[in-house]
A protein has these predicted regions:
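A feature for loop-to-transmembrane-helix boundaries and adjacent hydrophobic helices
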Residues: 1-189
Length: 189
């Protein structure tokens, strides 16, 4: 693009700001009825933020649902703090000798944001929720692919630096098992 000679370093600088932008985008759902859950909250003590949020249903009555947007905003704020810490203290340190120094903050953002979306998107139920099929959303599929990309990237780096190890196989088996477990849980819900 010609913006910089080192794109990975530029993405490292943008990653904490990107996470903070996601926080504000999620908090903007407070002013509309999007990003609410299927879970109805009937306990009056829990019918306020951070757990519940009121929406008006088609009959004109107010019902309280799990505030997915607020929980996502809190989780992404935690990711922002973690990325800022990592950016200011460890960004120039390679993960291991022989690994690249730049790009790790951006990979962490991609992985953590995808994990939050993969987890929380299953609770959403609104007009902007895009189904891929009857039980898995497009956002969940894209999040799983992003986590897979990070897994491939770091597996290649680790294989190059450490050689072939048993924990690579264990890590891949763990990814496949958690992906299968997530799919089964989504299907059963």
């Amino acid at each position: 693009l010609g913006l910089t000679g080192n794109m990975a370093r530029l993405l490292d600088c943008v990653a904490p700001g990107g996470a903070l932008i996601v926080v504000f985008i999620r908090l903007s759902a407070l002013f509309n009825s999007s990003c609410r859950s299927k879970i109805t909250i009937t306990t009056p003590l829990l019918q306020h933020l951070p757990i519940g949020s009121g929406i008006t249903n088609s009959m004109g009555a107010v019902e309280y649902r799990f505030a997915t947007f607020f929980v996502q905003a809190i989780l992404m704020l935690c990711v922002t703090v973690l990325l800022l810490y990592f950016f200011f203290t460890r960004r120039r340190l390679p993960m291991k000798e022989g690994c690249p120094r730049d790009g790790n903050v951006a990979w962490m953002f991609l992985t953590f944001h995808s994990a939050v979306e993969l987890l929380m998107d299953s609770t959403r139920y609104d007009s902007s929720f895009m189904h891929f099929n009857a039980f898995v959303s497009i956002v969940q599929i894209v999040s799983a692919v992003c986590i897979l990309a990070a897994l491939i990237h770091y597996s290649r780096l680790s294989h190059k630096v450490n050689g072939r190890c048993g924990y690579h196989v264990a890590m891949w088996i763990g990814y496949v098992l958690t992906l299968a477990g997530t799919g089964a849980a989504e299907y059963l819900v």
